[in-house]
Swiss-Prot record:
It comes from Aspergillus niger (strain ATCC MYA-4892 / CBS 513.88 / FGSC A1513). Glycans are attached at residues 30, 57, 117, 131, 158, 253, 306, 343, 430, 461. The gene is pynB. This is FAD-linked oxidoreductase pynB. GO terms for biological process: secondary metabolic process. InterPro entries: BBE, FAD-bd_PCMH, FAD-bd_PCMH-like_sf, FAD-bd_PCMH_sub2, FAD-linked_Oxidoreductase, Oxid_FAD_bind_N. The lineage of its organism: Eukaryota, Fungi, Dikarya, Ascomycota, Pezizomycotina.
Length: 541
């Protein structure tokens, strides 16, 4: 058969293309094998084959998922580190093999950006030690420790740390975002109680960041975003004892009560005494209120609530309890509505495993040294995974949301179906604590309240999923121009309509860029909304 000149050219092009694709596939395969070989040598603490997961493993799907069920991010390899030195070696492996390294402490990233496509995920969940000092004023704590396990470990020394409520959130992500809690109006954010941190840099070196060493890095890693400047492997935390508290939980089951309760909450809660921090949880047809009076008595709290005006709305169910120790305070409104003696407290929900999440579908679960912090009490039930869709907004002190706009938003929530499990978790801020340190979190002084919205997306019904996504797009379009640009970096949103760097980092952006340039000039540690070593588009420095 004779080929025309054109046919010959096309045949040659196809042959070249096939050859190029074959070479590219071979190169990728060789790179992956090079990475795996290096990682095998880096995991010096043993159990190498168990601590490396790639797409050939039947536990890969479980291992790549954190809390969010998603089918967008497929890392090349997941390595479960046990010591800081392993993390340093793993970073060097990624560099040599041509891969990015992505740290994962708790797996709660709202967009699943702690397991990015084609990367080496360095999982820190087994760097979860808690070493309390002899005088119990400080502790060295692994960045992968989950909050529930941390609190149980500190209970043994009759001390604690002002972190959040969710027991499966890890310390690394909490501090990197700022870290708010039901004690924050009196005590400030979790990041303020970090005395130092050890950080693996992009070149694989391990440095200590504190107020006297690598001060710029120390500033950035507290509230300047996670997985950006280096990989934090552990923290030195300042510990404390909480005074006994009084707790309140109030619920309303009439849909018509949602707006008046929420409006009263925003008018009243953020301007109460700093010892009182509270939130409302707004649903499709109900609303509830939760508050902690740190150091207050039951009578003091009853007086506060009686004067709030909340009890004049609808027919509320009210629970108020006093003399609540630290664990009772954290459990109140979630697993109990009564503060009981310490030896009667059911702390099961806090006794989370290093791998705490529920099984997804019939995919086998990854298990490695999955032991609870306290083997003497029942293990926490697996934390449910779901397809989260969410948004975050800060209400600023100089831009309080008008009542009519709040009502519109609540009416929008009522339009979603029951399957969405729509939830607005709205916290009173207006932090007046004098403990503020110099750190990167940008909204501490101006935040009046924080509003998070979330639904359970549908994995099986594309029409329903599209409806939910449009609802969030409509919420962004309606609410963002009215409430402002500020959002919480711990609740990132790929579909935010504003410049994400301005929204998450505010006036800290330019200083954070300088830190990034100093410690990671080649942008080795990155995710779609991470600070870059050059000034981001739309930002003026």
């Amino acid at each position: 058969m004779r080929l025309s000149a054109r046919g010959f050219v096309w045949s040659a092009l196809l042959a070249c293309t096939a050859s190029a694709l074959s070479e590219a596939a071979a190169t990728a395969s060789n790179s992956s094998q090079t990475l795996r070989t290096c990682v095998s040598q880096a995991l010096v603490a043993g159990d190498v084959n168990t601590r490396i997961i790639d797409p050939s493993n039947d536990t890969y799907t479980d291992a790549r998922l954190g809390e969010k069920i998603q089918f967008n991010e497929f890392p090349a390899l997941i390595a479960y580190a046990k010591k800081a030195e392993e993390v340093a070696s793993l970073v060097r492996c990624a560099q040599r093999s041509g891969f990015k390294a992505v740290p994962r402490s708790g797996g709660h990233h709202f967009e699943a950006w702690s397991a990015l496509n084609g990367t080496l995920v360095i999982d820190l969940s087994h760097i979860n030690h808690v070493n309390v000092s002899a005088d119990t004023t400080t502790a060295n704590v692994g960045a992968g420790i989950r909050q529930g396990a941390l609190y149980l470990a500190l209970d043994e020394h009759n001390v604690t740390f002002p972190g959040g409520i969710c027991p499966t959130v890890a310390l690394g992500g909490l501090v990197s975002s700022g870290g708010f809690s039901l004690q924050m109006r009196a005590l400030g954010l979790a990041a303020e109680y970090v005395q130092s941190a050890r950080v693996v840099l992009a070149d694989g070196s391990l440095v200590t960041a504190s107020s006297s060493s690598h001060e710029d890095l120390f500033w950035a890693i507290r509230g300047g975003g996670g997985g950006t400047y280096g990989i934090i492997v552990d923290f030195d935390l300042q510990l404390m004892q909480f005074p006994t508290s009084a707790m309140v939980a109030i619920s309303w089951n009439a849909s018509s009560d949602r707006y008046p309760v929420a409006q009263r909450f925003f008018d009243w809660a953020p301007v109460q005494i700093p010892a009182f921090t509270s939130q409302v949880n707004v649903y499709k047809s109900s609303i509830n209120f939760l508050g902690q009076y740190l150091g207050g008595t039951e009578n003091e709290l009853r007086k506060l609530i009686n004067e709030s005006g909340l009890l004049n709305i609808g027919t509320p169910t009210v629970y108020i309890s006093g003399n609540c120790d630290t664990d009772n305070s954290r459990l109140f409104g979630y697993t109990s509505y009564e503060c009981v003696p310490a030896n009667e407290t059911n702390r099961q929900i806090m006794n989370v495993l290093p791998e705490p999440f529920s099984q997804y579908s019939d995919y086998p679960q990854y298990q490695y040294e999955n032991e609870p912090e306290d083997p003497s009490i029942p293990i926490a039930e697996p934390w449910a995974r779901f397809n989260r869709i969410s948004k975050s907004f800060f209400m600023q002190k100089d831009n309080i949301l008008p009542a009519a706009d709040l009502k519109t938003v609540i009416d929008m929530m009522g339009q979603l179906d029951t399957d969405s499990e729509i939830w607005g978790e709205w916290h009173a801020w207006n932090i007046s604590s004098a403990t503020k340190a110099d750190y990167a979190f940008p909204w501490r002084e101006q935040a009046y309240a924080h509003l998070e919205f979330q639904v359970h997306g549908s994995l099986t019904n594309s029409t329903k999923q599209a409806t939910y996504e449009k609802w969030f797009a409509d919420l962004e379009t309606y609410l963002r121009p009215k409430i402002g640009v500020a959002s919480y970096s711990g609740e990132m949103d790929a579909h935010i309509s504003t410049n994400p760097f301005e929204s998450y980092y505010g006036d800290s952006v330019c200083r954070l860029v300088e830190v990034k340039k100093a410690y990671d000039p080649d942008n080795f540690f990155t995710n779609p909304d991470a600070i870059t070593p050059t000034v981001p588009e739309g930002i003026s420095c």
